[in-house]
């Protein structure tokens, strides 16, 4: 250990200790003594470095360097100089673990940003700027994972990165490539600049294996593709990994991307599934430790750093969705939050923090030896002595004794957390079990046995298992009281399996006898509701607290408005989450009211339609504001500037939505119209034409409504009823809509217009649409031509959608599509409007079938007896269709049970539309 030539190091004692601690420090001193002496003169290596200091140092060293090899040499020498400084500080107790790991992480950030900037210019010169489909220059989003993300890097850590970009597109140069390929090349160069080993060493080892699909997948991924991956393929261990994710470079698009990952990591409900994932990861690590014989690894071995992190992270994943303070990336910060929240005892927090800091100091001492990424205690006496000098222990045995004490405390707490004591229900419940087995068939009995022996149950924490055992007899008792116990049991078991990790729901069901009974009754009537609750357990919150009154329109509007007020306009994922939960929870309320309170059909349809309309109106408002924020307001057709009150945009509901007849699984038939000056530009800094503005509002609306996520989507949307169908523009101006309907539309499109109704958007534009609708529908038409066209369309639907001849022979009747079904009545109502409203304009006023029939009777076009008979038939068939939807059954029913109703409908069909249909039922 030669130090004679180090005349500028005033504190030779500190220098000697540094060199005793680290062979690597000796090597750096031999190679870069002049640099180190200059650095020492500044502050004697005593002061901490701020993030600004570090970024400025990197910038100053690399300033004006154009040559790649020179850039790589300079940054590697800077890294060696700083490593010497940090080893000096650590060996001489001039820093602490938190400060040291923060500075190391800041240096990594600075190097990544510098490498990213240096790598970009040659690519742009060759391929041009990467431009997204929205016309914006695309940036490479660099996400730091693991210790880098948490700003907890150790002395010789690798850095875990993920590369992303906002959206697809192409570069604008002569040698154009797509944005993804550009970002891949960009990322590859960034890695090379930092990771490649030269004569001067490396800067950071770069690990990209945490990206979606890991090794072998594309190096850079779009925001949308990442979101889709997490929703469809994200695994539990990836939730642990993404806790520490941090945007190192990428601006607002990076922030948006990170915000998108939050619901994947932190579930809204208390989520005990995190235990299972932790056990699996721990088992995998234990197998690896045994295979590689690395029990002395202070990170992966029993009681090591990883177990402390697991303890903290499992609580973060379980409770982080409801306790935002637990979402912090840093282990020690989150550990203290766990203590403050009462999730860990204060003494446990103190012991874990003490052990963690000790283990991290040992880790630094090991890595300082030779700048190697290892956490294994050395075997060589010389290296052991260096560690003893750093940590200030007299003998190796003394050190090991202290280390084992810390590891034992961590290990005991970890074991306490993941103990797996699972048994069958207590023998005191044997009598109930016997009663249950007496009424269950063999399949159901096997299901009970498999449930209590399942791996999923064995992975539950003991507290959750105990709650499940407490819940079980209450569940059996409720099943035994059911009129259909076998059916109720089979339908509810998937729900029990779904929520058994979220034991708060089990407790709530136990505490509310009425809720348990309602759940069992509902299960016998509606497997659809059971499946919704099973797939989206968060809806249980609503079910357990609902009063089974149908929701009122004003209450729906107030509720959704209040929820959305708390969300910023650019927090798209949160907006979609609120919209999805609003729709699903309120539809569930309606279904429960339908099943348990036997609410009238018309009121049920009104409520379902209200939920859809409120959702559409709120979504349109969000979409409009988002486009305005980016591009400014458009001008309307008269040249006036639009506003949030005068939007110039409206949504038209067709089909069941327009007819106020929505069912439980109905999609929404929508048409978008606008009143913009299509050529005039918006008044924002990124202006677009009025036509482009209208298109983007509609596209944003559809994205918010139809994007598939873990919570499903808000609604399925069908826009094919717009002018010219799928070949037509997504959004139509009111004037173009008018011209199309008056000059180009087929009669079936006017049929569809009968059930059209403006449901959201600017009031003035909506009124103009309603006036136009009435104008079109009340045109004078040849009654025979209308009859022929209606008949042709109806026959086409029967041929494609109705029951086959073979099915009819077996007594099958399709409630909706066969003769005498719902569509026959709808077509008759539409025929009345198209054929008779020229002379009777009031027929065109309403869009729902019942009121059209009432108006036809009022106008004398239909006898009151016939109108009443049709309404009764229609309501009976629709009520049955609702019941079948809730029961997850098809619309094919026993024809014999519907013969009288069908005869009523078919006789009127024969009289109004098709005299040749007299044998419709007889032929079956």
Swiss-Prot record:
Enzyme Commission number, as recorded: 2.7.7.89, 2.7.7.42
Cofactors demanded by this protein: Mg(2+)
Taxonomic superkingdom: Bacteria
Pfam family, one: GlnD_UR_UTase
Reactions catalysed according to its record: [glutamine synthetase]-O(4)-(5'-adenylyl)-L-tyrosine + phosphate = [glutamine synthetase]-L-tyrosine + ADP; [glutamine synthetase]-L-tyrosine + ATP = [glutamine synthetase]-O(4)-(5'-adenylyl)-L-tyrosine + diphosphate
Annotated region described as Adenylyl transferase, given as residue ranges: 424-924
Region (Adenylyl removase) location: 1-422
Enzyme class of the recorded protein, top EC level: transferase
Keywords: ATP-binding, Magnesium, Multifunctional enzyme, Nucleotide-binding, Nucleotidyltransferase, Transferase
BP terms from Gene Ontology: regulation of glutamine family amino acid metabolic process
GO molecular function, a single term: [glutamate-ammonia-ligase] adenylyltransferase activity
Residues forming coiled coils: none
One term under GO cellular component: cytosol
Family: Belongs to the GlnE family.
PANTHER family xref list: BIFUNCTIONAL GLUTAMINE SYNTHETASE ADENYLYLTRANSFERASE_ADENYLYL-REMOVING ENZYME, GLUTAMINE SYNTHETASE ADENYLYLTRANSFERASE
HAMAP family attached to this UniProt entry: GlnE (MF_00802)
Main function: Involved in the regulation of glutamine synthetase GlnA, a key enzyme in the process to assimilate ammonia. When cellular nitrogen levels are high, the C-terminal adenylyl transferase (AT) inactivates GlnA by covalent transfer of an adenylyl group from ATP to specific tyrosine residue of GlnA, thus reducing its activity. Conversely, when nitrogen levels are low, the N-terminal adenylyl removase (AR) activates GlnA by removing the adenylyl group by phosphorolysis, increasing its activity.
Record-given protein name: Bifunctional glutamine synthetase adenylyltransferase/adenylyl-removing enzyme
């Amino acid at each position: 250990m030669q130090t004679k030539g180090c005349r500028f190091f005033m504190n030779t004692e500190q220098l000697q200790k540094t060199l005793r601690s680290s062979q690597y420090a000796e090597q750096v001193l031999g190679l870069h003594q002049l640099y180190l002496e200059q650095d020492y003169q500044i502050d004697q290596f005593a002061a901490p470095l701020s993030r600004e200091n570090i970024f400025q140092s990197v910038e100053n060293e690399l300033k004006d360097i154009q040559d790649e090899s020179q850039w790589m040499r300079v940054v590697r020498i800077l890294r060696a100089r700083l490593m010497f400084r940090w080893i000096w500080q650590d060996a001489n107790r001039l820093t602490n673990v938190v400060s040291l790991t923060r500075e190391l992480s800041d240096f990594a950030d600075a190097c990544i940003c510098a490498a990213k900037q240096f790598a970009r210019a040659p690519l742009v010169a060759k391929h041009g700027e990467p431009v997204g489909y929205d016309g914006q220059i695309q940036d490479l989003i660099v996400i730091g994972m693991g210790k880098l993300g948490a700003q907890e890097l150790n002395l010789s850590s690798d850095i875990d990165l993920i590369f992303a970009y906002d959206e697809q597109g192409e570069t604008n140069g002569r040698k154009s490539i797509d944005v993804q390929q550009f970002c891949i090349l960009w990322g590859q160069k960034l890695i090379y600049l930092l990771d490649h080993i030269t004569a001067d060493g490396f800067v950071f080892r770069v690990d990209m294996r945490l990206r979606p699909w890991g090794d072998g997948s594309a190096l850079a991924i779009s925001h949308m593709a990442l979101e889709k991956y997490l929703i469809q393929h994200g695994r539990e261990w990836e939730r642990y990994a993404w806790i520490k994710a941090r945007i190192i470079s990428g601006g607002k698009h990076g922030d948006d991307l990170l915000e998108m990952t939050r619901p994947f990591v932190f579930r809204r409900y208390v989520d005990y599934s995190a235990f299972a994932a932790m056990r699996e990861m721990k088992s995998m690590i234990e197998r690896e430790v045994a295979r590689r014989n690395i029990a002395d690894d202070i990170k992966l071995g029993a009681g090591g750093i990883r177990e402390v992190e697991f303890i903290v992270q499992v609580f973060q994943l379980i409770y982080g969705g409801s306790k935002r303070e637990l979402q912090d990336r840093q282990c020690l910060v989150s550990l203290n939050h766990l203590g403050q929240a009462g999730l860990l005892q204060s003494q446990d927090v103190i012991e874990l923090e003490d052990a963690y800091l000790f283990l991290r100091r040992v880790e630094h001492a090991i890595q300082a030896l030779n700048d190697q990424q290892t956490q294994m205690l050395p075997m060589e006496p010389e290296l052991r002595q260096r560690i003893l000098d750093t940590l200030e222990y007299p003998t190796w045995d003394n050190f090991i004794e202290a280390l084992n004490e810390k590891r034992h405390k961590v290990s005991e707490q970890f074991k306490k957390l993941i103990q797996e004591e699972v048994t069958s229900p207590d023998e005191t419940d044997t009598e109930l079990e016997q009663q249950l087995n007496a009424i269950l068939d063999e399949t159901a009995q096997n299901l009970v046995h498999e449930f209590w022996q399942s791996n999923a149950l064995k992975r539950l924490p003991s507290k959750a298992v105990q709650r499940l055992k407490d819940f079980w007899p209450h569940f059996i008792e409720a099943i035994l009281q059911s009129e259909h116990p076998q059916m109720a049991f089979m339908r509810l078991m998937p729900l029990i399996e779904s929520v058994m990790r979220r034991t708060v729901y089990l407790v709530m069901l136990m505490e509310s006898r009425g809720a348990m009974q309602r759940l069992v009754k509902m299960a016998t009537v509606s497997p659809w509701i059971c499946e919704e609750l099973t797939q989206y357990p968060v809806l249980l919150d609503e079910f357990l607290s609902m009063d089974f009154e149908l929701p009122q329109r004003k209450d729906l509007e107030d509720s959704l408005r209040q929820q959305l007020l708390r969300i910023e306009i650019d927090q798209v994922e949160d907006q979609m989450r609120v919209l999805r939960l609003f729709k699903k929870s309120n539809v569930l309320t309606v279904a429960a009211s339908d099943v348990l309170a036997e609410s009238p059909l018309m009121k049920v349809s009104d409520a379902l339609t209200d939920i859809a309309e409120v959702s559409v109106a709120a979504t349109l408002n969000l979409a409009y504001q988002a486009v305005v924020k980016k591009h400014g307001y458009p001008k309307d057709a008269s040249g006036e500037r639009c506003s949030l009150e005068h939007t110039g945009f409206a949504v038209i509901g067709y089909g069941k939505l327009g007819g106020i007849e929505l069912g439980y699984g109905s999609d929404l038939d929508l048409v978008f119209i606008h009143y913009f000056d299509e050529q005039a530009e918006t008044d924002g800094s990124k202006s677009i034409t009025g036509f482009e503005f209208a298109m983007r509002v509609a596209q944003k609306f559809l994205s918010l409504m139809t994007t598939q996520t873990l919570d499903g989507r808000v609604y399925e949307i069908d826009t094919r009823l717009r002018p010219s169908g799928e070949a037509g523009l997504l959004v139509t101006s009111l004037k173009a809509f008018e011209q199309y309907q008056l000059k180009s539309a087929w009669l079936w499109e006017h049929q569809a217009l009968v059930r059209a109704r403006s449901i959201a958007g600017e009031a003035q534009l909506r009124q103009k649409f309603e006036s136009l609708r009435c104008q079109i529908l009340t045109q004078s038409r040849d009654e025979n031509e209308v009859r022929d066209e209606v008949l042709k369309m109806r026959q086409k639907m029967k041929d494609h959608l109705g029951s086959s001849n073979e099915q009819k022979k077996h007594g099958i009747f399709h409630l909706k599509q066969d003769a005498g079904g719902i569509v026959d009545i709808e077509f008759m109502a539409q025929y009345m409007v198209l054929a008779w409203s020229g002379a009777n304009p009031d027929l065109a006023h309403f869009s729902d079938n019942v009121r059209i029939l009432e108006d036809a009777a009022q106008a004398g076009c239909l006898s009151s007896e016939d109108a009443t008979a049709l309404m009764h038939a229609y309501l009976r068939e629709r009520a049955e269709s609702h019941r079948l939807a809730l029961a997850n059954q098809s619309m094919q029913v026993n024809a014999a049970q519907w013969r009288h109703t069908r005869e009523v409908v078919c006789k009127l069909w024969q009289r109004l539309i098709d005299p040749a249909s007299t044998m419709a039922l007889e032929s079956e």
